[in-house]
């Protein structure tokens, strides 16, 4: 409750392509399957969220040492930095869930986000 600024990256959950948690071996195949079944599309500080930016209730939730999801949401200035077009959907979902206040991206990702905005 005393945190006023957060700076983080954002994880994109497309396990067969980009999930660094999967490629690094941090998550087992059964855990990746569970995340997919729960509709996870991204994570902030290893707190997983769905397409609406709502926290997903997974078996990993209670085993993760990170700020609680509701505490993170209360931070007044949540800054997220990202690069790579594969992060676009996770960013849109996080914005929908009010998980990002300030966004820093590369030019290709910025263009992808603009293109997504035009189709909605």
Q: What residue ranges belong to the model's regions?
A:
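Conserved phosphate- and dinucleotide-binding cores of soluble alpha/beta proteins
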Residues: 1-120
């Amino acid at each position: 409750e005393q945190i006023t600024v957060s700076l983080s990256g954002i994880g994109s959950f497309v396990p067969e392509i980009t999930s660094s948690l999967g490629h690094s071996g941090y998550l087992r195949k059964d855990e990746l399957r569970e995340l997919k079944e729960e509709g996870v599309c991204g994570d902030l500080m290893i707190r997983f969220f769905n397409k609406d930016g709502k926290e997903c209730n997974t078996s990993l939730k209670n085993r993760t040492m990170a700020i609680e999801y509701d505490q993170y949401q209360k931070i007044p200035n949540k800054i997220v930095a990202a690069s790579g077009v594969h992060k676009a959907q996770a960013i849109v979902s996080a914005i929908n869930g009010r998980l990002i206040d300030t966004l820093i991206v590369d030019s290709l990702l910025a263009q992808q986000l603009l293109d997504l905005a035009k189709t909605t």
